[in-house]
Swiss-Prot record:
Species of the source: Shewanella sp. (strain MR-4)
Residues in coiled coil: 3-67
The protein, known as: Cell division protein ZapB
Signal sequence extent: none
Known role: Non-essential, abundant cell division factor that is required for proper Z-ring formation. It is recruited early to the divisome by direct interaction with FtsZ, stimulating Z-ring assembly and thereby promoting cell division earlier in the cell cycle. Its recruitment to the Z-ring requires functional FtsA or ZipA.
């Protein structure tokens, strides 16, 4: 191989290595975003469950009050 071909090959290899490093950094960023989104999803799921329980409790209270009103009428 000529020196020119070796130089071109070296340049391409270096560019490929740089691309790989950039992709690794992007992958790490995406993993962090996914982790954050997963935590937020878990928090929202828990909050949703709590709100559903509160709603059910209020519905029971309202149903009880309506029942009391109907029995007094």
């Amino acid at each position: 191989m000529s020196l020119e071909l070796l130089s071109k090959l070296e340049t391409k290899i270096q560019a490929t290595l740089e691309t790989i490093e950039l992709l690794k950094m992007e992958l790490e960023e995406e993993k962090q975003k996914a982790s954050t989104l997963s935590e937020q999803n878990q928090q929202l799921t828990e909050q949703n469950q709590q709100l559903q329980q509160e709603l059910a409790s209020w519905n029971d209270k309202v149903t009880g009050l309506v029942g009391l009103l109907n029995s007094e009428i």
